[in-house]
Each structure stands twice: as C-alpha cells, then as structure tokens.
Amino acid sequence: MSSPSAPLATPDVELDVHTLSSENLPWLCIVWDDPVNLMSYVTYVFQTVLGFSKKRATELMMQVHTEGKAVVSSGEKDKVEGDVKKLHTAGLWATMQQAG
C-alpha cells in the first residue's frame, strides 16, 4: 500500500451565501404511501385537489406506490402548507420539508 505523497490542492471557491441560504430554498409537499387509500383514489385526489392531468396524477401515484413517497408540489411555504392541508382533508398522508 502506498502512502499519500502530498495533499491534493483545492481551488479557491467563493460561495454566494445568499444563494445557499436556506431561506431561499423552496418547500416540498411529499405524499407518503399508506395502507388505506386505493391507488385510484390517490390518482383522483391528485387530479381534483392539485389539478394534475390524469396521466401525471397516475405517474405520481405510481411513484408513491413503488417508492413510498413522491414530491407533488413545491414553492413558497404558505402555498405548500395549503397543499398539505388539502391533502390531509382528502385523507392522504402528506408532509412538508424544505428542499436541500
């Protein structure tokens, strides 16, 4: 086994702190798989509550079903809170978190 000769140089990188600030990151609405709701109902909710086309609603429902969760909306905190509340009212398991 050879020993390292010299540390690798790292280039000088200036980070724009404002760009990386968590305040600038969008919020995500995540729907989680649950043992209660039928796939057809989840698709229906995505169409009627979030306004997705049947094709997109089906794709998101399948992502929830196969991967356990899907991001169904993103944006400002107030908007995403509203989406989570609507999904809860429809009986789906939804949470929100900040991207990043």
Curated annotation (Swiss-Prot):
Gene3D superfamilies: 3.30.1390.10. It comes from the Bacteria. GO terms for biological process: protein catabolic process; proteolysis. Binds to the N-terminal domain of the chaperone ClpA. Involved in the modulation of the specificity of the ClpAP-mediated ATP-dependent protein degradation. Belongs to the ClpS family. This is ATP-dependent Clp protease adapter protein ClpS. It comes from Corynebacterium glutamicum (strain ATCC 13032 / DSM 20300 / JCM 1318 / BCRC 11384 / CCUG 27702 / LMG 3730 / NBRC 12168 / NCIMB 10025 / NRRL B-2784 / 534). The gene is clpS.
